[in-house]
Amino acid sequence: MIFPVARYALRWLRRPEDRAFSRAAMEMALRGVRKVLCVAEKNDAAKGIADLLSNGRMRRREGLSKFNKIYEFDYHLYGQNVTMVMTSVSGHLLAHDFQMQFRKWQSCNPLVLFEAEIEKYCPENFVDIKKTLERETRQCQALVIWTDCDREGENIGFEIIHVCKAVKPNLQVLRARFSEITPHAVRTACENLTEPDQRVSDAVDVRQELDLRIGAAFTRFQTLRLQRIFPEVLAEQLISYGSCQFPTLGFVVERFKAIQAFVPEIFHRIKVTHDHKDGIVEFNWKRHRLFNHTACLVLYQLCVEDPMATVVEVRSKPKSKWRPQALDTVELEKLASRKLRINAKETMRIAEKLYTQGYISYPRTETNIFPRDLNLTVLVEQQTPDPRWGAFAQSILERGGPTPRNGNKSDQAHPPIHPTKYTNNLQGDEQRLYEFIVRHFLACCSQDAQGQETTVEIDIAQERFVAHGLMILARNYLDVYPYDHWSDKILPVYEQGSHFQPSTVEMVDGETSPPKLLTEADLIALMEKHGIGTDATHAEHIETIKARMYVGLTPDKRFLPGHLGMGLVEGYDSMGYEMSKPDLRAELEADLKLICDGKKDKFVVLRQQVQKYKQVFIEAVAKAKKLDEALAQYFGNGTELAQQEDIYPAMPEPIRKCPQCNKDMVLKTKKNGGFYLSCMGFPECRSAVWLPDSVLEASRDSSVCPVCQPHPVYRLKLKFKRGSLPPTMPLEFVCCIGGCDDTLREILDLRFSGGPPRASQPSGRLQANQSLNRMDNSQHPQPADSRQTGSSKALAQTLPPPTAAGESNSVTCNCGQEAVLLTVRKEGPNRGRQFFKCNGGSCNFFLWADSPNPGAGGPPALAYRPLGASLGCPPGPGIHLGGFGNPGDGSGSGTSCLCSQPSVTRTVQKDGPNKGRQFHTCAKPREQQCGFFQWVDENTAPGTSGAPSWTGDRGRTLESEARSKRPRASSSDMGSTAKKPRKCSLCHQPGHTRPFCPQNR
């Protein structure tokens, strides 16, 4: 199922400011509710929540997806005894993508992607989950969203809401808000249901759409171009771009270039040591260092000449080592990388698993402040049984309880990461990460380490030197937190004013060192500082630049940019656009926050950001050679390209608006070289106008038809095959196919298809006329002198008159060529019968040889009947049936049409074999006709209406096709014996068949 993004809204939802419901309101809202559908973000979460709410008495059954089970249990919800049906999705249920015609890389110029329509659809691997939700929704009266309470979780919740409300629009929707899967948390969530927050979901929609547009446009631009320029190196390489990827890569490149540009400098310093009976003490120069050798040498010589040291000051003061702050996501990623050597992606994967198992709180949080209503004492008590840290947990309780060190950040959604349940059954990295979270939590709730710092300052030849010592008095949190180190450094006792002879006074040289390459923790810190990504996406962006080979890792796990990464950053920087800098993306992240807060409109942010990146893209394409030059430094000289068009598909130029969906129709080329107009809404809209195969060249002219609506409808330049047009007509001319010129439509034999082909659906030839006329007639009047304009009017005036019957025995097909005479060889009632067919197979012309010959004037009148009627569908408004003249006023002599109304009788006025022949048709206006047609002179039982005989897929009628399958009566029999009327197999009434039965509509 496809969901247009622009229409994705739930108007019944109240504003998030009023999202809390009173208990009385909830009891009223849920009155009469018997079954409640609950949907979590993952199966493990659904199982855990259901187990806690049901006290372990849930009933499990299978869903349509084998990975997402269904858990049922009885529950008392707001005064109602209800059955809770708990199931899950697997992350995002829907995905963003361009409409089908833009998905292939060669389908359009990448610039189009900034404006191309985007849709939300359900990926194939999630269809079973979607069907499960639809099936369960039909049995339920309310829906409760149990997805994670962050931006992504809120958006996933709205995807679930969209799917469920499509099945049951009046479904009540509620939101459960929780931060951990514990009995208290989930029951509290059930007792305080709120409504989903549309604004938070909107922010995610904006971010997803921008990431798709920007990423797809730049990725296609880079990949298509650089693969052509450097085929030997990049032929198989996907060169992706992302507005978070590139700033992340930029940090790595910037540090690497800083190291490359670093010039070491020699410095000099004076070092003093004193060999005391209690140990060797090193005194540091208060000047630290000097870069001037002579100056340092002079001071050193003064110290050597008078080396006696005088103690000028002895200070002693308390020193504390702070315990860690409450743990948020970014700190978890950084500390796990530094202390445990687990990368950020793996850290978050393990943390998610521990969360769904109920061992820790929600791991994606920006909060480092414990809320006052969170019972920390209970959480500390849970850890007392452990032999490793249980005694420390007990000591916290004995000293008056936990006193956490809080930070200053809160996302108002989740508390800091903390353990929620004790376990000793974990293994490997899961056990290591769980232990780290527990120890961090206990350390945070403990006390700072305490010590006494002593500072001794001495004077030698008026130069000052300092030594520091430390005595730890209370380790406190250090006893449970081995990831921090704080050691004693003993200083001997010195008295102020005392003198001593230093053991050594020496001048030592050193050299400044460059900064180190970034570690993952360093990179995450930079991303957070500059607002690149969120705590939930940092790891993903880092993994992407590694997977694309933009960066690699050194043996000590530091990031080193690759040649491709360096070339891309340098190339864009040389264009004047610092796309590797964080400013553009940081601005977007700030806007997304404002959308969540209701301070900015999502559409305004979307429009501004698209235009900003689109302008950058246009100029980047114009300066693309700078990108080539930057990469050539690493890959060697590449292939020269003459023009941009050698790489990117041309921008499709719209000819007119589609009469079905109002999207642009563009000129395209068929595989065999022919031309047609295709709707940009394909495949949802399959409208197309097929030009005949005799058209050798077709292109859009700059002129616009002044008549056809809606404006603009561009004219076409056409060049025809020699001999395909009457001799009096030019082979090249400019014309309008917007529907204003009936004669031109007949000359071009325009064919229009409005839907997907079916096996039983014949291909008609005048549906172009049907659609074009509808557009033409319904939107502007057609004065008699304006129907033919410009060159098409001149063409119409030079048309030869129709050939009189008997002047030639040749039969002409719809292409204007002489048809070929063939004989039926297949076994059956028509074996041996001869028929005419298109010689080239280009058109669908077909005519039995023993049928009346229409002559060279064109194909038989029946061949002009519309496609829709062959399936029982009424022709569209404005349809002109070829060969039919003006409507007559006669009644149908008792014959009824498909509307069960009396038909009218009309007469064929157009020259041809059927001129003067009468027929019955629907009496309603052309726009409302049911499609009924019957010749008056056909032998039909009085008072009955025959089934319509619309053209089949090869020019013969369905009625004659049905007759050909039965034994054929002799001509005398057919002339003297009335046919038995056929009956419908559905209602058993004569006059029509099942496809045309009113009961089958």
UniProtKB/Swiss-Prot annotation:
GO MF annotations, alphabetized: DNA binding; DNA topoisomerase type I (single strand cut, ATP-independent) activity; single-stranded DNA binding; zinc ion binding
Catalytic activity: ATP-independent breakage of single-stranded DNA, followed by passage and rejoining
Chain positions of all zinc fingers (C4-type): 658-685
Zinc fingers, GRF-type class: 813-852, 897-939
Entry EC number(s): 5.6.2.1
Domain called Toprim: residue spans: 35-179
Tissue expression from the record: High expression is found in testis, heart, skeletal muscle and pancreas.
Segments of skewed composition (Basic and acidic residues): 953-964
Positions of the Topo IA-type catalytic domain: 197-617
Reported impact of residue 362 to F: Decreased DNA decatenation
Keywords on record: Disease variant, DNA-binding, Dwarfism, Isomerase, Magnesium, Metal-binding, Mitochondrion, Primary mitochondrial disease, Progressive external ophthalmoplegia, Repeat, Topoisomerase, Zinc, Zinc-finger
GO CC aspect terms: mitochondrial matrix; mitochondrion; nucleoplasm; nucleus; PML body; RecQ family helicase-topoisomerase III complex
Active site feature: 362 (o-(5'-phospho-dna)-tyrosine intermediate)
BP GO terms, sorted: chromosome separation; DNA recombination; DNA repair; DNA topological change; double-strand break repair via homologous recombination; meiotic cell cycle; mitochondrial DNA metabolic process; resolution of DNA recombination intermediates
Binding annotation for Zn(2+) 2: 897, 899, 922, 930
Locations listed in the record: Mitochondrion matrix
Family the entry assigns: Belongs to the type IA topoisomerase family.
Protein name (Swiss-Prot/TrEMBL): DNA topoisomerase 3-alpha
Species in which this protein is naturally found: Homo sapiens
